[in-house]
Amino acid sequence: MIHKRFSIFKYLISIVISLPFLYGGDNTLKDYVNRSDTTFSYNERHTYSKDNYTVHVLEVFSQTWKSADVVDRAHWQHWVNIIVPDTLKYEKALVLISGGSNGDSPPSSVDDEIVSLALMSNSVVIEVKMIPNEPVVFSDETFKRSEDAIIAYTWDKYLRTGDADWPLQLPMVKGVVKSMDAVQDFFRSILNDGNAVNEFVLLGASKRGWTTWLTGAIDDRVVAIIPVVFDALNLVDSFNHHYGAYGFWSPAVGDYEAAGIFDWFPRPEIYDLMKIVDPLNYKDDLMMPKFLIHSAGDEFFVPSSQFYFDKLDGPKYQRYVANTGHGMDDKLADVIISAVAFYRAILNDYTLPEFSWEVVEDGSIRFETVTEPKSVRIWTATNEDEFDFRYYTMGPIWKDSLLTESESGVYIANISEPLSGYSAFFIEASYNSVYPYYYTFSTDVSFLPKQLPHAATISFQVMGVSGNEGAFSIQGDMTSQMIRELFDDGQHDDQEAGDGLWALTLKNVIDGEYKYNVILHENDTMVKQNDVPLSFLVQNGHVSGTTSYLIGSVGTINEGVVENFNLSPAYPNPFNPRTTFKYSVKTQNHVSVNIYDINGNWINTIVNKMQHPGHYEAQWDGSGLSSGIYFITMVSGDFIQSQKALLLK
């Protein structure tokens, strides 16, 4: 048994089967932002002085995105307000990323709240407007789009074409980066003060909060970020949680539903998009201090920090604001106090509070603080009918009460599971800062009962054959057609290590019908084990159908399939940059041949058509890819086979 487990371990190490969504980097965004663009320019439209401060208004042309043949607003323009207090003390500046409509005249004034930020902080405050440029009309449409409607349109174009310049997040980030470039050049070249602004702290809300994350990930000048009401990192899991809670897509995300974006969730292409737009994909570049501000009643997002906050590294803080919607409503002034306190801490290198928390298996929250708090509170909300805590549907349902220490520095929040419906709760702690400011931070939100009404936690199990030296995985709709490894280590609902029972638990499998295959990995090949796709149904959170599979005789099951259909090893192998492979088709059928990387991520489609019986040959060009192990996978009807290919550059 020890020898068997060691052999399996060696095999798994050799092919490195892993989760489909690893939080590594992707260069698409950075390459787009750094791409030379002669459109970039700026000019000073006017300057005016008031008591204690001066405002410079720049007109910045950041880029050409797409072309006039594709969209009526190809050349992006931004109004940039620079507020310089007379008592300037810092070389860090706060960048407020905001919206605005195309065609607006140069700003003649700045909001009093923005001016106050500059005066209170004694730092430069920069407002970058028109992120994104909107509204726009695309050439294949006759109506205007704004905000999420533009994003949804561009995502659909990317998913259908693979054109990496489509996602709107790319020009949104570049608009901010080039505006920061313009501000620094303006201080250096026009004001002859090259040291006025050397570093930036970014703050943006909603789509601009999204942009805050992504800009911070690719620009080294950013030393801290304050993203507001964008509670959707690890986006696919977060939105599966969203649907699992409601059983429908909230109207707030209706633009994405109308564009069919959620229909891509069972397909591998969605993860290629996530590599570009999901901030968690850039976690290694987000080590700077972070203060995340969320609405506990956001109509766009179900509280979702549990899917990503613990994966973030570096100084990190968050706050859920009770009894608010996406716009923060009447709590906006309090939110500004929290943001300013954090910003002043960054400016002055103040020591921020030290604390930690854990959501325990029973749903309770354990909060431990090293720094003495002003107060610690529990916020609770109950909906006796359904899982819905949206402010615009439920109103101010959150209630708070003080928590007392269970032991020194330890606070426990625990509530009873409701007799009907759902409850939610979180801990909020306030800490002193330099008067009159204070810090307010919170934990993740815990929900009871833990099982969502429209999603299920499912344990998939495969019982192997005695003496089998291979490993098993599953691939299907619930894995977005990505290969997911099963385990025989005694830690994944598989009872004992090495007992031949392979298992994997998937959370938040939302209502719907699913098909999948069981795959054996052995001798560097992947062979489907089931003659017909396995299937199951999730309905109102209940599961019916096949979620476990008993392997009878692996060789007998697949002997006929391999004889009739075949994918031969690639030659040359290793290769650079091209290799050729042959395959055989016995009966007329649809054939697809796809390339996957070592993590199971879809790379490219080589063949995707109906083919007659016969022998075929195809070539794969790996130009543009990094060296590594890739899998060539052929699917025709119920047949699936893979061959490993090594690209060496």
Question: Model features per residue range: what roles?
Answer:
Residues 101-104, 123-177, 232-246:
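Cap/lid segment of the alpha/beta-hydrolase catalytic domain
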Residues 214-263, 319-323, 328-334:
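Hydrolase active-site cap/lid region
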Residues 286, 292-294:
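Short beta-strand/loop motif that positions the catalytic acidic residue
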Residues 341-380, 395-410, 453-455:
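Surface beta-strand/loop "capping" patches
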Residues 386-411, 467-511, 521-536:
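Aromatic-rich carbohydrate-binding modules that target alpha-glucans
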Residues 432-468, 505-557:
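The feature marks proteins involved in alpha-glucan
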Residues 557-571, 575-595, 617-620:
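Glycine-centered coil/turn sites that cap beta-strands in beta-rich domains
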Residues 619, 623-649:
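C-terminal tail/sorting-segment detector
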